């Protein structure tokens, strides 16, 4: 009876924890940056998981392991929190604290959950099914839609990294099934088919970093497992991988073309060189977590045609954003995991199944860490969550073999049973309410943008006001509100001087607030410059100088702001300085831009000035681009089948 009670007591925790993790993972897969609502839902569910685990621990307490890996992870997360104090845009850094810190949060949630074996079996099975679904999506995108394989991710590289994290632990379980004579015969066959699909999908992405990480990690898995398993299982696993690679070459062939070009990857080299120049500006304490994309533009090489959001090297980017201590602590986490593996594998009494599973989990983490030298896995929420879970399982197995000491925190000695749930709920309400506000504010912000496009100025004004009340430190809302008021001034009749002045002053207040909470956003100064430029009577005698200075500051922060550059050139042109105006435009023309109709005024003005100043061939090049964009805009048609 005592045993039955013990098991029954642990079951609700396991079921709830598994459910909350999986429910949190699904919106995380859809979060790519702007979709803050998905991020908020994920974090709320993780906070609920934390609350559930803590609430169950009043009598038994929480067992905190005393290991180097747990310590390094905690110190890394603590440093991320400390770095918020000097961030140049704290509201963005706080979001990234939870974003990047999901690795540590999920690790601790797994570690503190009572029955971790059951939690792992539930979560791992669903993650494997999810991996198959995403793999099939990627294959469909390539073979049928003739697109890059990326499933729900923004890039094929992150899609491949996610599949690597699933495939390598699954490979370890496949080896165990092949060696287990008591396992049903169809189990190894089914898992073998799953692995073939995963490998095929990874190779189909033609991601060089993911492919090399897979090869490296698989080599480690095979090397460390060969002595303890029948060779038949290892050979079958390698044949599955080779068959998937050959199938990819026959059906697609892009990976074979891209792999030899790895040493000539000039695109990433350009990004790394520019990022290194940014690093030298603040190497010790960093610029603030999540602010790379805002600080990068002034250092950006014009030939860099990337989105500019990431350094494509997590270790370099975390150094830039959190300083040298952040990098050292991240590396300490990796070395602590490696040292834990070495120590555990030296235990001679360890079972074969634990040894192979432990190695497979480590190899999954190794693949993610290896690819992070050329990518940005640390900033992919779903990958960080699964990495935290895998690291938690790896840590659990190692501790079980090493019998490491732990510290038990007993809340019952400090807080009564009735007061405990009230205190826990109140404490967790703080982050939960923050995430609710974050998600709602972004929804109102998106709603305001739609309303503004539809000409509903008053409705957009109300939506932005609500968003600002929810997140007062988000500069996006403030900039959008200022721009809305700038536009509203143009809609008023000429004799409405009083209303224009009120809107003008309020717009300046919004811009002042935006500049205060985020000094890196160049768009703030573009809107300010336009406000001065369009309202000379309200700007005063020095309005022209104010507008000019605003545009200069905008371009100093982000030289690719071509709309602000066009406005700046127009001001200079009004004074008859064609050479200077063209020079301003030419500076912007050094950069690569995605084709969009918004570029037409920029290219048209530059082409006009080039022709007037005798640069006929250069003008013709831009005129051809304008014609192409105009033709593309005119030809755009949204089909409807209903």
Stretches with model-predicted labels:
Residues 269-309, 315-318, 322-329:
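TM-adjacent membrane-interface loops and short helices in multi-pass inner/ER membrane proteins
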Residues 444-642:
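C-terminal luminal/periplasmic domains and tails of membrane-associated envelope-modifying transferases
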Residues 2-32, 43-54, 75-84, 95-252, ...:
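Alpha-helical transmembrane segments of multi-pass inner-membrane proteins
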Residues 148-149, 214-218, 241-280, 297-298, ...:
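Flexible juxtamembrane loops connecting transmembrane helices in multi-pass membrane enzymes
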Residues 234-249, 410-440:
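Internal/C-terminal transmembrane anchor helices
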Residues 28-40, 57-62, 88:
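Short, hydrophobic transmembrane alpha-helix segments
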Residues 181, 399-415:
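Flexible interhelical linker loops that connect adjacent transmembrane helices
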């Amino acid at each position: 009876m005592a045993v039955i009670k013990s098991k029954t007591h642990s079951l609700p925790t396991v079921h709830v924890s598994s459910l909350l993790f999986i429910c949190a993972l699904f919106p995380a897969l859809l979060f790519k940056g702007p979709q803050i609502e998905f991020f908020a839902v994920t974090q709320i569910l993780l906070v609920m998981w934390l609350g559930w685990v803590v609430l169950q621990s009043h009598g038994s307490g929480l067992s905190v392991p005393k290991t180097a890996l747990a310590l390094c992870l905690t110190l890394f997360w603590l440093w991320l929190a400390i770095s918020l104090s000097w961030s140049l845009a704290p509201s963005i850094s706080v979001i990234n604290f939870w974003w990047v810190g999901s690795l540590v949060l999920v690790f601790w949630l797994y570690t503190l959950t009572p029955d971790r074996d059951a939690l792992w079996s539930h979560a791992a099975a669903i993650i494997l099914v999810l991996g198959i679904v995403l793999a099939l999506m990627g294959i469909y995108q390539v073979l049928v839609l003739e697109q890059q394989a990326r499933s729900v991710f923004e890039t094929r590289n992150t899609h491949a990294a996610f599949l690597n994290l699933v495939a390598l632990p699954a490979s370890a379980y496949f080896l165990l099934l092949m060696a287990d004579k008591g396992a049903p015969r169809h189990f190894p066959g089914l898992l073998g088919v799953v692995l073939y699909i995963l490998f095929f999908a990874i190779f189909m992405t033609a991601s060089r970093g993911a492919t090399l990480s897979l090869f490296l990690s698989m080599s480690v898995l095979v090397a460390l497992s060969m002595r303890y398993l029948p060779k038949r299982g290892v050979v079958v696993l390698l044949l599955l991988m080779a068959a998937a690679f050959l199938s990819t070459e026959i059906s697609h062939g892009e990976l074979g073309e891209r792999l030899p070009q790895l040493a000539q990857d000039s695109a990433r080299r350009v990004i790394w060189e520019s990022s290194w120049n940014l690093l030298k500006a603040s190497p010790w304490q960093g610029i603030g977590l999540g602010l790379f994309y805002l600080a990068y533009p002034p250092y950006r090489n014009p030939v860099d045609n990337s989105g500019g959001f990431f350094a494509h090297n997590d270790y370099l980017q975390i150094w830039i954003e959190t300083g040298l201590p952040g990098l050292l602590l991240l590396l300490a986490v990796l070395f602590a995991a490696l040292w834990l593996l070495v120590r555990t594998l030296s235990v001679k009494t360890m079972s074969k199944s634990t040894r192979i599973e432990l190695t497979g989990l480590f190899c999954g983490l190794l693949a993610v860490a290896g690819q992070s030298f050329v990518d940005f896995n640390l900033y992919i929420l779903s990958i960080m969550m699964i990495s935290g879970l895998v690291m938690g399982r790896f840590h659990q197995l190692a501790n079980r073999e090493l019998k490491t000491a732990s510290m038990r925190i007993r809340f019952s000695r400090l807080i009564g049973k009735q007061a405990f749930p009230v205190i826990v709920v109140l404490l967790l309400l703080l982050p939960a309410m923050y995430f609710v506000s974050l998600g709602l504010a972004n929804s109102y912000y998106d709603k305001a943008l739609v309303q503004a496009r539809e000409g509903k100025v008053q409705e957009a004004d109300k939506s932005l006001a609500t968003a600002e009340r929810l997140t007062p430190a988000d500069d996006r809302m403030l900039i959008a509100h200022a721009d809305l008021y700038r536009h509203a001034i143009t809609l008023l009749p000429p004799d409405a001087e009083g209303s224009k002045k009120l809107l003008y002053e309020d717009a300046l207040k919004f811009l002042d607030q935006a500049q205060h909470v985020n000094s890196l956003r160049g768009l703030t100064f573009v809107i300010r410059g336009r406000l001065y430029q369009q309202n000379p009577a309200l700007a005063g005698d020095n309005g022209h100088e104010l507008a000019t200075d605003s545009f200069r500051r905008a371009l100093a922060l982000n030289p690719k702001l071509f709309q602000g550059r066009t406005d700046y050139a127009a001001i200079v042109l009004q004074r008859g300085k064609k050479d200077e105006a063209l020079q301003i435009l030419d500076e912007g023309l050094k950069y690569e831009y995605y084709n969009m109709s918004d570029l037409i005024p920029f290219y048209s003005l530059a082409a006009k000035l080039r022709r007037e100043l005798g640069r006929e061939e250069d003008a013709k090049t831009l005129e051809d681009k304008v014609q192409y964009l105009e033709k593309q805009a005119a030809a755009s048609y949204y089909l409807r089948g209903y």
